[in-house]
Regions:
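Active-site neighborhoods and metal-handling regions in enzymes and metal-associated proteins
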Residues: 1-380
Length: 380
């Protein structure tokens, strides 16, 4: 595995820069602050990783400070976890974390909320400080998160390289008679052995007609000698995701599949070619559908054809902005990273999804992983 090298890391200096940009947004919009919940946005800005529960834990970012809002009995644990320096403020079991936040914000200021916060906590804050003082912080937060830094792109690249290597090992493993559950277990083991955060974040392994279901079928499957194979999997490195899909057959000769595979690859290439700085995300989805329409597939979301959007952003979340979908007029910018996967579904027969990811540079699009070479050659 010649791609292996030291794993890139997000430094404290980079997190401080992110925080500085967030504060610029806070001041620019006349906010008292932004409240981050136990979401990937908390990790993005502060480095603190926390799994959500009914007890609120998060961070209040103001123009001059960062304060961590922590259940009293969790203080010692939080102090041991990596996070940017800031005051730790405690609330006890009989107290209201929403009331504590209201006191910190003070009178009159508006508080922008992490859009990953649960609805029940929004209601608690509205009761404590008034709904008119709450604002949606999602646009500000996600506007920063969707432009990846060089370090973030390096982490995604590392994760993609790792998963592509696992895909190659799967291809070598597959033979008629193997069960999909065996392959899923193998994928997880290989990701773990290669150093992924928690093994596979997911693994979809489908054979035959099950490949026509975009997210796979329930139950175990056995690979037949003439089955179409779809493998979609990914992992995380320091929180950043990979996500790659390959669809292929072990032997050639199925003309219907091979023709459909080449249409899929043509559509995938059309998305790449349409990816230009300033282009609307929707235009990439349109490019894929034009290819399919040329081959009498679709139109729109009709089957046989493409039943879903052509791609999604990824980073600390496997699905995040920007979304490559109709109606999204977000302009592509350098640093954006997103999938290219205009799947073609032939109901109850087979589906073909070739998924590779793109990062936008000042000079245009760049593949994280080279596209598949052919219907029986899943790697370049």
């Amino acid at each position: 595995m010649s791609w292996q090298h030291s794993v890139p890391r997000i430094t404290e200096d980079e997190r401080q820069l992110r925080l500085s940009k967030l504060r610029q947004g806070i001041e620019g919009e006349g906010l008292a602050g932004v409240l981050l919940g136990p979401t990937e946005s908390l990790r993005y800005f502060t480095g603190l990783v926390w799994h959500p529960s009914e007890r609120f834990l998060g961070a209040l970012v103001t123009p001059s400070a960062i304060s961590y809002i922590v259940p009293g009995f969790e203080r010692s644990r939080v102090e041991t976890l990596p996070h940017l320096p800031g005051e730790i403020l405690l609330w006890e079991e009989e107290e209201s974390s929403a009331a504590l936040i209201s006191r910190l914000v003070g009178q009159g200021g508006r508080l922008a909320l992490d859009d990953g916060l649960p609805l029940y906590f929004y209601h608690a804050l509205a009761a404590a400080m008034g709904a008119e003082r709450l604002a949606d912080g999602g646009r500000l937060i996600r506007g920063l998160r969707r432009i990846k830094s060089a370090a973030e792109i390096a982490l995604i690249q590392y994760a993609m390289n790792l998963t592509l290597d696992v895909h190659k090992q799967v291809h070598a493993l597959l033979k008629p008679g193997i069960r999909s559950s065996e392959v899923v277990d193998f994928i997880d083991r290989q990701h773990r052995q290669a150093g992924a955060d928690d093994g596979s974040t997911f693994a979809i392994v489908s054979f035959g007609a099950a490949t026509s279901l975009p997210h796979g079928a329930d139950g175990d499957q056995v690979l037949g000698p003439s089955d179409v194979i779809l493998v979609d999997t990914g992992c995380r490195i320091d929180g950043y995701h990979s996500d790659i899909t390959r669809t292929y057959m072990l032997e050639g000769g199925d003309r219907e599949f091979e023709r459909a595979w080449r249409i899929e690859r043509e559509a995938q290439q059309a998305v790449f070619d349409a990816a230009r700085i300033g282009a609307a995300c929707a235009s990439l989805d349109d490019a894929a559908r034009k290819v399919l329409a040329k081959h009498s597939l679709g139109p729109d979301y009709r089957l046989p054809g493409l039943p879903h959007r052509a791609g999604h952003g990824l980073g600390l979340e496997i699905h995040e902005e920007p979304y490559i979908v109709r109606g999204n007029d977000t302009a592509l910018a350098a640093g954006m990273c997103f999938s290219n996967e205009p799947m073609i579904v032939f109901p109850e027969k087979f589906g073909i999804r070739l998924e590779d990811h793109i990062t936008m540079t000042e000079d245009g699009p760049r593949w994280f992983t080279d596209p598949a070479a052919g219907p029986t050659e899943p790697f370049a």
